[in-house]
């Protein structure tokens, strides 16, 4: 799992 990509997706959804 690419955590950097996952975190980026979560941040995009959160914003």
From Swiss-Prot:
Changing residue 8 to A: Slightly increased activity against all bacteria except P.aeruginosa. GO terms for biological process: defense response to bacterium. It is found in: Secreted. Antimicrobial peptide which assumes an amphiphilic alpha-helix conformation upon contact with membranes. Insertion into membranes involves Trp-3. Penetrates into cells once membrane has been permeated. Active against Gram-negative bacteria (E.coli (MIC=1.7 uM) and P.aeruginosa (MIC=15.8 uM)) and Gram-positive bacteria (S.aureus (MIC=14.3 uM) and B.subtilis (MIC=0.8 uM)). Has cytotoxic but no hemolytic activity. Binds DNA in vitro. Belongs to the lasioglossin-like family. Expressed by the venom gland. The C-terminal amidation is required for full activity. The keyword Lipid metabolism does not apply. The keyword Lipoprotein does not apply. Signal peptide: none annotated. Keywords: Amidation, Antibiotic, Antimicrobial, DNA-binding, Secreted. This is Lasioglossin-1. The modification Lysine amide is found at residue 15. GO terms for cellular component: extracellular region. One of its GO terms (molecular function) is DNA binding.
